[in-house]
Design a protein with these regions (language model features):
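Bacterial N-terminal signal peptides
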Residues: 5-14
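Short, low-complexity N-terminal intrinsically disordered segments enriched in polar/charged residues
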Residues: 19-47, 51, 55, 73, ...
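Surface-exposed, charged secondary-structure patches
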Residues: 22, 58-63, 68-121
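Residue-level "edge-of-site" marker
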Residues: 54, 62, 143
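Beta-strand-connecting loop/turn residues
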Residues: 55, 110-111, 133-134
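Short beta-strand edge/turn micro-motifs at domain boundaries
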Residues: 114-116, 123-149
């Protein structure tokens, strides 16, 4: 009985170490999913979008047509992702040469993750879920770049 208790204690002690060992790999997989998302838009690569975005994605946000205009709500369903990528391939919707591509991973758990992307269109807050072993973007809340403070 004592051996059984000792064995159970060793196994239980090893479990957090194993979970922690998986965390960096999961963080990297989440980062790669977000990178596929932004590069899919920047390069017009629908393959990357298919690889990283759930067809059930919900993307909602707030955009401004110009720096002095008001924000307007905007929704982007999955088919619009593919149309946008096709537009980039056709020479429309291209990002500026110095377009930002900053990815910050906030949290990664066993089934869910969250991240922030700063891109040329603004800031995206992304929620990801593990679907069939892959990290997929399921929700995006975004906004155009905020107004810059007035200079004197």
């Amino acid at each position: 009985m004592r051996v059984l208790a000792l064995t159970a204690a060793v196994i239980l002690a090893a479990l957090p170490a194993r979970a922690a060992a998986q965390q960096p790999d999961d963080r990297e997989q989440v980062r790669l999913a977000v990178a596929d998302y932004v590069d899919g838009f920047y390069q017009g690569d629908s393959t990357r979008l298919v690889r990283s975005v759930s067809p059930e994605v919900r993307k909602n946000g707030y955009w401004r047509a110009s720096p002095d205009s008001a924000y307007r709500p905007s929704a982007m369903p999955y088919p619009a992702f593919m149309r946008f990528a096709a537009g980039v391939q056709a020479g429309r919707n291209r990002p500026p040469a110095n377009a930002p591509r900053e990815i910050v991973i906030f949290d990664v758990q066993d089934q869910t993750a969250s991240a922030k992307l700063t891109a040329w269109w603004g800031t995206d807050y992304l929620l990801l879920g593990r679907e069939n072993g892959r990290w997929m973007i399921t929700h995006v809340l975004w906004q155009s770049p905020p107004p810059r403070p007035a200079t004197r």
